Amino acid sequence: MDHIRNIAIIAHVDHGKTTLVDCLLKQSGTFRANQAISNEERIMDSMDLEREKGITIRAKNAAFKYKDYHINIVDTPGHADFGGEVERIMNMIDGVLLVVDATDGPQAQTRFVLRKALEAGAKPIVVINKIDRENANPHRVLDEVFDLFVSLHATDEQLDFPTVYTSAKEGYAKIDIKVPSTDMSLLFDAIVKYIPAPRAHAGVEFKMLVANLDYSDYLGRIAFGKIYSGKVKIGDAAACLHGDGRKTEGKITAIFHFEGLKRIEITEAHAGDVVGVAGFEDVFIGETITDNITRQPLPFVPIDPPTIQMQFAVNDGPLAGLDGKLVTARHIWERLTKEIRTNVALRISQTDAPNIFNVCGRGEMQIAILVEQMRREGHEVLVSRPEVIYQKDPEGKLLEPIEKLFLEIPKEAMGVAMENLSGRKADIVHMDHHGNEVTIEALIPMRGLIGFETDLVNMTRGLGVMSHLFHEYGPDRGEIVARKNGSLVSMEDGEAMSYALNMVQERGRLMVEPGEKIYKGMIVGENARENDIPVNPCKAKRLTNMRSQGDGKGIQLDPPLRMSLERALEYIGPDEYVEATPKHLRLRKKILDENQRKRAAQSRAPKAVLA
């Protein structure tokens, strides 16, 4: 047990966390020098989406050997929508590597994960990365990191953190920035020296806290976590102590640990190690696996509650089934059920309508990632606008989720940001100026956060950073105006014609190009005014045997407005859907027929309350 180290790596997007892990795995000999690492860099980001978006979504494990030590690494997601992942990881580790860019310094998302780590009592090592960059300023960054620790109420012991200067790209680490170095051995030594051995007891009964789940078609659910005490062998009788008080008896059918990124099957495991065990089909994150049904469960950090819900519906549009193979309600429900086996922060439920399902999560990004994964797997699905989950207090008053928002923005963007926040009913709690940056802390309703990330990118030209945590359920703060513009809605089925689109674009911005398939009820553009207008984008120019004066003049169409999935989900109104298929993203009305839409609007009931 003294030769095991469990560490997490914390870093802001693009500060080189994943590259650093690649470097550690290569230099520790986990990958042979001539072995191709899946022919691409960034080994830890194994999901396609993670590579594309440059973010870590799922917490993943890796491990390497250094001298006699077995070092387990857990990669932490930095995005606050995946906060559920971060909190669980903290139970497994004893120390953290805080990776900070030598030019940019610590950012808002680093703060979110670091706070959780310090609260859990983890021992930090600060790694100042990318010191090979021309404009690197490691000394200033070190001062900023120290200030960050102080502002997060770190203990005196945590404030006395060791610092290692690295270039993960070039593959070297230094303790003294002036002394040349050729490899990462100083960082390996620091991990072994400063990070304590796991908090665990060797001699007593076997207990393990489940922090992550995986699924295998042969073994069923595999529960990953740290062994807090005792040891376990394949074939041992075991018990699972569930969160709701139930207890299930079973048998350990397989044990895994990590070497590099591979899961290696082993026959027994001891206290302090991070392993996966199979044998319990209905085990869930936060539950305890132990050797006997009479044992007490281990304490568990509760995960932030879901605060947002969306509806997933079967694609019933005229173009359904042209792109995707998996289009029925059964396919969607099976995929959602599979997702919640491993994704703890999601909840799913069926509704009164057989082809509509509710999906609740921590934020729109998290649910958008799920929709994007489903598209790639061949699903077609309709997704509604995110709605917040309300609660009622004992007196029957409405309570809505309030989030704590952390913003880091350039000084010149402060005015527009404050104006935007006040329109979203945010209360500014704290503001801090440092150099050309401003850090803002605010309490904002979850409704106000929907669509804020896109606004932030526009207001700060991509330089703003945000993260948010669940704060409390508070009184309803009144109406927030979401979108001021109405939609241009097609009243015909057919193909978009440039002649017709030329007339439609006088009313607002187009979202389609000539030649695209269109159907009744599909949104083809954004109206310049607040109301919806039915338009006919499929009208062809009548041919006559008389030439008019305008003949031969080319029609000039503005480039259409194209949206990413996240942006589309924020953009649509409450009576609209995003139609996500493997090849297309379309916006449409929930009710396609115009007359039925008008009737529904007249008889629309007041806003439903989620108890």
Which ranges hold each PLM region?
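Structural and coupling elements of P-loop NTPases
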Residues: 1-611
